[in-house]
């Protein structure tokens, strides 16, 4: 019997409290993601398309059989502008480095050059697609 495909998920987003996720260890977040993925597989999902957060490490762990889970098609970090849908910083958080990464699922990139660089970087890291979070959502 063919498996199901989840076309929009964020396996690193183990809670809707994104502020709490931003202070978690990346290793802990990955462990939680693997737990989520085992559950997805047990519900019949054999492929998932992660649209922000998962990367080559998550996909490789499944491919090599290190963890049990569905095949992962990933977009790496979702791209967002300052104040966009993927800018999860609190009002008191600032940054000066234009390559600043918003924790876990998105990445800030303001302007054409920064967006071009971010796309190229995510593709370099193996992203199968690119998600752009252009405005509030």
Positions of PLM-derived features:
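Metal-associated gating/positioning segment near the N- to mid-region
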Residues: 1-64, 82-89
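Metal-coordinating catalytic core of metallo-dependent amide/deamination hydrolases
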Residues: 66-137
């Amino acid at each position: 019997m063919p498996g199901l495909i989840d076309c929009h998920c964020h396996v690193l987003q183990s809670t809707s409290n994104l502020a709490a996720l931003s202070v978690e260890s990346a290793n802990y977040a990955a462990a939680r993601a693997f737990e989520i993925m085992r559950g997805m597989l047990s519900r019949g999902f054999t492929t998932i398309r992660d649209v922000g957060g998962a990367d080559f490490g998550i996909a490789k762990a499944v491919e090599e059989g290190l963890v049990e889970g569905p095949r992962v098609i990933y977009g790496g970090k979702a791209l967002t502008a300052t104040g966009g849908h993927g800018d999860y910083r609190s009002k008191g958080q600032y940054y000066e480095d234009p390559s600043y990464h918003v924790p876990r699922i998105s990445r800030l990139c303001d302007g054409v050059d920064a967006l071009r660089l971010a796309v190229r970087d995510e593709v370099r890291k193996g992203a199968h697609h690119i998600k752009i979070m252009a405005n509030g959502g």
